[in-house]
């Protein structure tokens, strides 16, 4: 894999969710913030992270820096995914289905942010079970990691690409 300078890339960053969390101490409550951040290049690479800090902007910045390090490649075919896939994490399940050109991104909240950051323009999605943003993001990314393109499937099966497509 080629290491790319993050300053060379035009990255799309989306804040999925911000939480205020409290630590109870002897003198009362200490508040801090956590931010779920998704980062992508809009061309098939996406990553996510959770940033935590005492201030919201700092939590977002930390999340962005960490998300850049977790980016991975998503196989795309004409701005959609190559096949249907189910991603699961905890009680959250996310169904991802390829869609024809012109359909758009049919997705809600957390899933939409990931699709836009990854550069997927036509897709149908459905969240099943838990709608918790943490688990939905992780389930969606797990589904995207399970995607395989035709060339890889052909190689794994020891066949030619045209045999797989037919």
From Swiss-Prot:
* Keyword tags: Ribonucleoprotein, Ribosomal protein, RNA-binding, rRNA-binding
The domain comment in this protein's record states:
The N-terminal domain interacts with the head of the 30S subunit; the C-terminal domain interacts with the body and contacts protein S4. The interaction surface between S4 and S5 is involved in control of translational fidelity.
Main function? With S4 and S12 plays an important role in translational accuracy. Located at the back of the 30S subunit body where it stabilizes the conformation of the head with respect to the body.
Q: Which family does it belong to?
A: Belongs to the universal ribosomal protein uS5 family.
Q: Which GO terms describe its molecular function?
A: rRNA binding; structural constituent of ribosome
This chain belongs to which protein, by name? Small ribosomal subunit protein uS5
Q: Name one GO cellular component term.
A: small ribosomal subunit
In the record, biological process GO terms are:
translation
Matching entries from PROSITE patterns are given as:
RIBOSOMAL_S5 (PS00585), S5_DSRBD (PS50881)
Which Pfam family, giving just one, matches this sequence? Answer: Ribosomal_S5
Q: Where is the S5 DRBM domain?
A: 11-74
Q: Which domain of life is it from?
A: Bacteria
Annotated InterPro entries: Ribosomal_Su5_D2-typ_SF, Ribosomal_uS5, Ribosomal_uS5_bac-type, Ribosomal_uS5_C, Ribosomal_uS5_N, Ribosomal_uS5_N_CS, Ribsml_uS5_D2-typ_fold_subgr
Q: How does it assemble?
A: Part of the 30S ribosomal subunit. Contacts proteins S4 and S8.
């Amino acid at each position: 894999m080629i290491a790319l300078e993050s300053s060379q890339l035009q990255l799309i960053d989306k804040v999925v969710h911000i939480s205020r969390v409290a630590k109870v101490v002897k003198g009362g409550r200490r508040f801090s913030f956590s931010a779920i951040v998704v980062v992508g290049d809009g061309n098939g690479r996406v990553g996510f992270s959770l940033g935590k800090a005492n201030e919201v902007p700092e939590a977002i910045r930390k999340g962005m820096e960490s998300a850049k390090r977790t980016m991975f490649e998503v196989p795309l075919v004409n701005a959609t995914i190559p096949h249907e896939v189910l991603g699961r994490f905890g009680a959250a399940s996310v169904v991802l289905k390829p869609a024809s050109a012109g359909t758009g991104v049919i997705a809600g909240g957390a899933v939409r942010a990931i699709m836009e950051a990854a550069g997927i323009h036509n897709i149908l999605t459905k969240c099943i079970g838990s709608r918790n943003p943490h688990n939905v993001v992780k389930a969606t990314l797990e589904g995207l990691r399970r995607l395989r393109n035709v060339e890889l499937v052909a190689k794994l099966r020891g066949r030619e690409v045209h045999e797989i497509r037919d």
